[in-house]
């Protein structure tokens, strides 16, 4: 797999379930079931990504468990516990023009309407009402900021997102 084809991590494999190699699944998708919309999966085992197919999955109480191709014993499943689950970027669904994957916003420069470079998006936090960009300020920030928290509210604070140019234009006071 080439370096520009780094998998997008959608979850991880949890503990074993039963003696036939089933594993609990932790999904980072909006809904737990969403992770099963993608096939094949890539599993990062011993630092290497490899392809794997989900044979079947089901709810087991509040947990979700899955049977993976080639994993038929509890011992083999234990070897996969805590391995990341990923997919290739081209497997991701296309989004409407005004929606973005978080991974595309990470690393974008944040510039306000006065042209002030406020820093780079380091993380995004889901708060319930709206997502919040955690912007790591530049080393020599004129306002002495280390980090800024900007609500991701398009049309109000977020004026333009240029994913290709890795830049976000905001209406935000750099001293706030």
Curated annotation (Swiss-Prot):
Q: Which GO terms describe its molecular function?
A: ribosome binding
**UniProt entry tagged with the keyword Cytoplasm:** yes
Cellular localisation: Cytoplasm
Key word Nucleus present: no
Question: Which InterPro entries does this one have?
Answer: PRC-brl_dom (IPR027275), PRC_barrel-like_sf (IPR011033), RimM (IPR011961), RimM_N (IPR002676), RimM_N_sf (IPR036976), Transl_B-barrel_sf (IPR009000)
A GO CC annotation recorded here is: ribosome
Annotated PRC barrel domain residues: 97-176
Q: Name one GO biological process term.
A: ribosomal small subunit biogenesis
| Keywords tagged on the record | Chaperone, Cytoplasm, Ribosome biogenesis, rRNA processing
What does this gene product do?
A: An accessory protein needed during the final step in the assembly of 30S ribosomal subunit, possibly for assembly of the head region. Essential for efficient processing of 16S rRNA. May be needed both before and after RbfA during the maturation of 16S rRNA. It has affinity for free ribosomal 30S subunits but not for 70S ribosomes.
Stated family: Belongs to the RimM family.
- Domain remarks in the Swiss-Prot or TrEMBL record: The PRC barrel domain binds ribosomal protein uS19.
Q: Assembly state and interactors? A: Binds ribosomal protein uS19.
Q: What is this protein called?
A: Ribosome maturation factor RimM
Which species does the entry assign this protein to? Shewanella sp. (strain ANA-3)
